[in-house]
């Protein structure tokens, strides 16, 4: 089984439609306190609009969610009526691009996970991400996640599912995870994730395993404690980079590996290390610490969490 874990917002004005996909729940914690990551696309009837194919995919995903909705039929119908009205509105547009050209960069697409619907097949966010990347070689993999899966064997399920990615011999693996408060005088820093996952990460990347710990309160940045809740995967290659940001944790349910939540992410593709408005994909992760503040795997205590990940059905 799975849960509805996607966070998708569609805002409609007279001449503009905005799609927001992110990691934050529609709560005060999500929008005011946590460290979250959002991506927004604007659609309007001019040639510089984001291509309408992404919006249509998002509306189709919302319609799919309605299939499993347990709300009253009238509420469900209002959602379907709204997506239909948005489709009708943009159908009248004549200048907005319909899709990206084959070699156009940067480009973006919607990547979702969901269980098997009445007609069609289940969708895996990780499988789609890998299909977008292959057969390119990976020179760097960055994972930002507050949760990982609970392991039942010698391999981490998600890492094992990425085994077909061709890795450069010196590929770096960057793990951006929350830091738990340590007892006073402690010499090692605490990560509230299973020790087994840390072992699997080190096994995968060896001496090139990197860890960035994001504390709840960063000096000169935060006025109050803030939990890391953002989720992203950055794949870097020799000539191309892919950045996926949205609701998918680095867990089997989040990535759609054997078990499927309803998840939504945007995947951006660009030339390697390309700057847009002064920012690379690394910068857009928005981490509040320096990339130079990495921590040795040997200086970390991995602390098994007492509860299952938030995206696991209860």
Which functions belong to the PLM regions below?
Residues 1-314:
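PLD/PLD-like phosphodiesterase catalytic module centered on the HKD motif
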């Amino acid at each position: 089984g799975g849960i509805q874990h996607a966070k998708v917002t569609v805002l409609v004005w007279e001449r503009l439609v905005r799609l927001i996909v992110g990691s934050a729940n529609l709560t005060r914690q999500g929008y005011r306190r946590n460290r979250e990551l959002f991506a927004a696309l604007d659609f309007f009837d001019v040639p510089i609009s984001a291509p309408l194919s992404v919006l249509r995919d998002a509306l189709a995903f919302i319609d799919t969610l309605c299939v499993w909705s347990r709300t009253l039929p009238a509420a469900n119908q209002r959602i379907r009526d709204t997506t239909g009205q948005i489709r009708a509105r943009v159908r009248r547009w004549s200048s907005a691009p319909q899709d990206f050209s084959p070699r156009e960069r940067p480009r973006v697409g919607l990547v979702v996970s969901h269980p098997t619907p009445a007609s069609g097949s289940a969708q895996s966010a990780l499988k789609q991400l890998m299909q977008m990347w292959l057969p390119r070689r990976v020179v760097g993999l960055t994972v930002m996640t507050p949760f990982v899966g609970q392991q039942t064997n010698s391999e981490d399920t998600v890492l094992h599912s990425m085994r077909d990615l061709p890795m450069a011999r010196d590929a770096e693996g960057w793990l951006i995870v929350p830091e738990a408060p340590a007892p006073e005088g402690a010499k090692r820093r605490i990560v509230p994730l299973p020790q087994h996952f840390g072992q699997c990460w080190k096994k995968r990347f060896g001496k090139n395993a990197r860890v960035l710990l994001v504390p709840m309160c960063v000096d000169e940045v935060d006025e109050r404690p803030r939990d890391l809740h953002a989720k992203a995967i950055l794949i870097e290659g020799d000539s191309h980079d892919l950045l996926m940001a949205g609701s998918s944790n680095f867990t089997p349910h989040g990535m759609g590996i054997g078990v499927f939540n309803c998840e939504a992410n945007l995947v951006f593709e660009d030339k390697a290390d390309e700057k847009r408005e002064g920012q690379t994909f690394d910068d857009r992760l928005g981490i509040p610490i320096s990339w130079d503040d990495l921590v040795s795997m040997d200086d970390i205590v991995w602390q098994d969490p007492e509860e299952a990940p938030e995206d696991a059905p209860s």
